[in-house]
Structure formats: structure tokens, C-alpha cells
Amino acid sequence: LGDVYKRQVIGTPDGVCFAGDALLTENVLRHVKLPYCDHVGLDLKSKEAITKLPYQHWILSHKGPFDGNIRELADKNMDLVRLRLAELAKLLQRPMTRDEFYQESRRLIGMHIGTYDQLIRQERHLRPYLEQLVIDGTARLEVKNDTIYFYLNE
């Protein structure tokens, strides 16, 4: 569970779950522009699965102990991911190359590039969202003249 494929949470017999960064805290959610994950579909399933775990106390990255409503926190995490997917899908009103999509996405979300390293990191953040739009059928891709174009499915 978590933002990276095959990440695990660990539970103890006394009702504590070490969830790491499988969920973002409310404070992080208020500031994050685009939650990171390797695979958006699996990330959403992970967040849903966390709500079914039988723990009363949680240890979260960027927060430490959390004894609040884990269902509510997971829902807020999933809502942000789904919101970003919907916003990014709207960009595909016209055919776009991956680079065009990334550029428009950065403008929409307010991500700025200052260095090449920032560009690469941002593309790593955006790629799973673009891939999820194709996986779930919201968008499709076509190759024309050795260039991949992404389209919104009607």
C-alpha cells in the first residue's frame, strides 16, 4: 500500500498501523499540487483498502501519530487524486503530445520549472495520471508520424 508499487503498511498486535506515506495528512493535502504515485489505479485501491484495516491508531509520514477517522482521511486523499484526473482529462480537448500535455498540466496545477531536475520530477509525477486516463478509457493514444498523440475519448 502507498504511493510506490509494492510498498507495505505494518500493523502491530496492539492496534497500531505504521502506514508511512500511504495516505497524505490533511496538512499535506492542503499544500500538495499533485499527489505522487507510481500507478494511480493501484494507489486508489490501496487507499480504499486501508479503510478496511482493523486498526485504531495510525503512524503516518509527515505527521506521526494519527487517531482520527482514517476513512475520512482516505476519502480526502482519493478525492484529490480523482479531482486531478478530471482536471487533467479536460486538457485533452484537442490531440496533444506527451510534452504538450505535461506543459499544459504544469500550467493548470501551478507547477513551475526552475531546473532540469524539477522538470524530470514533475514529469514523473504527471506520467501515472496520463497513463491512468488511458487505462480507464478516458483517453486514448495514437501514433502518427512517429509521434504519440493523446485524445479524450468521446
Show the residue positions of the predicted features:
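Short, small-residue-biased leader/transition segments that mark boundaries at the very start
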Residues: 1-5
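Metallo-beta-lactamase
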Residues: 6-82
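Pre-recognition alpha-helix immediately N-terminal to the DNA-recognition helix
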Residues: 83-91
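C-terminal regulatory/interaction regions
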Residues: 90-154
